[in-house]
């Protein structure tokens, strides 16, 4: 989910809006932790971009763990998993934009920037939904496809 989210952000901010390149997009993520220094050029800039990618993957993994522990055990049907995933993805976007980004050291986008609807839908469909559907298949309440010992 971290990769699909990053790919969507790349399309919107790099290809459509022309506001970043791929490196500066990842540096923007790192700047939440390090401030403006993340926009350094050269080798340091590449390091900050790698840090940004790591932060993005780490946050995404955290959201997967939260879903796996708190929501997945309660979901009984694929339809319920899909609905829970879409809602969860939208809540991730809301949490990131109202709590995490404002607490960071970066200069973040206004809450209602020109792309907020696109990113809200993207988080619902490309982040929350895959988390829910993938983890639905691993829910221990259904018969496992693996042979038992």
Task: Give residue spans per PLM region.
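Interfacial helix-loop-helix junctions of multi-pass membrane proteins
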Residues: 98-120
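Internal alpha-helical transmembrane segments of multi-pass membrane proteins
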Residues: 73-94
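Hydrophobic cores of alpha-helical transmembrane segments in multi-pass inner/ER membrane proteins
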Residues: 122-136
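Short, charged juxtamembrane terminal tails flanking transmembrane helices
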Residues: 137-149
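Hydrophobic alpha-helical transmembrane segments
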Residues: 50-68
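N-terminal signal-anchor transmembrane alpha helix
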Residues: 1-19
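Extracytosolic (periplasmic/ER-lumenal) interhelical loops and adjacent juxtamembrane/interface segments
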Residues: 14-47
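Aromatic-anchored segments of alpha-helical transmembrane domains
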Residues: 2-7, 89-99
